[in-house]
Amino acid sequence: MRKLLTSLIVMAAIALVGCVTINVYFPEAAAQKAADQFIGNVLDDSGVARPAGGSSTAPARPASGKQPSAAVLDLLIPAAYAAESPDIQVRSPETDAIRERMKNRFGGALKGLFDSGAVGFTADGLVAARDPGAIPLDQRSLVDQENADRNALYAAIAKANGHPEWEGQIRKTFADGWVQRAPSGWYYRDASGAWKRK
């Protein structure tokens, strides 16, 4: 009886050790880098100047030291490793087409609407009319077209990376990126709904 109990305990311990959970997490740093490249491509190629002092270097990583107990545990239980710096794919035929349409709009009338303060960026990665009366009638559809492309872009990036559930995080990352890359004088609406001038 004692041997059976000991055997069951040992088998349960081995079974518990064998249970490994691998978390698929949102790669924030890779998403920020990808968003910055996409946004830079749209704004820079359409003639929008980069903000002064806008150095977008990623913060340095802390040194990764291992505790001795972790090294011993790694000897006993093989570790499952995920990619150290996962990649976010933002290039696909769909996103390339969206990028070109966005560049054309920014190279055309949309930049003028931002410069005049008639429109601004929102906290959810879209464009909103700040002063609808300042938007000429023939340009009012630009905001709707831009937002349709932005919604499609965020969904396409999440889908291209095999994680549709990341769409909200991708949207937030891009929303922050649009505001950071915006030139001085452009408006943005923060999470509370208040308009602010950069």
PLM feature spans:
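Amphipathic, charged alpha-helical segments and their helix-to-coil junctions
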Residues: 33, 44, 69-141, 145-149, ...
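Post-signal peptide N-terminal segment of mature Sec-exported envelope proteins
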Residues: 24-53
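Bacterial N-terminal signal peptides that target proteins for export
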Residues: 1-8
